[in-house]
Amino acid sequence: MSNSSSSSFVIVGFEYKGDVKQFRDIVFENFDVSEKYQKEIDKYVNDEYESYSAYYELCSILEKNGIDSIRDDKILIGKKLVDMDSDDSYVPDSEHDIDQLVQTVRDIRSKLNIETPIKIYTGTEQC
């Protein structure tokens, strides 16, 4: 549950200790997202933060900025299972294929050539 200035999340993913721009470049080089999201990418080409939305369908990126539960030296990368904003008073119904989630996260992790464990992260981020 969140208050008026925060959003709660549940994400299946892993910790990444690298630069978000570097991660974004790896995603565009290794996954077929550029064509699908090119219009969105072009729209936000000068706004680095907004351009992340172009590939959020593939993965979610959570940085320290505004998230108390994330240390300064890490980024969480994975798939969001729940993302509640201040207008939500309950957790929305959803169903997830665990095998598919884990495989997607493994694919992303493999492209980054890192071996950090896949975990479930929960927390609250500022809106």
Question: How would you label these PLM feature ranges?
Answer:
Residues 5, 70, 113-115:
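A generic structural signal for short, non-catalytic loop/turn and secondary-structure boundary residues
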Residues 1-29, 119-127:
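Short, extreme N-terminal segment that most often corresponds to the first beta-strand
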Residues 26-89:
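Low-complexity, serine/threonine/proline-enriched polar segments
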Residues 97-127:
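Amphipathic alpha-helical binding modules
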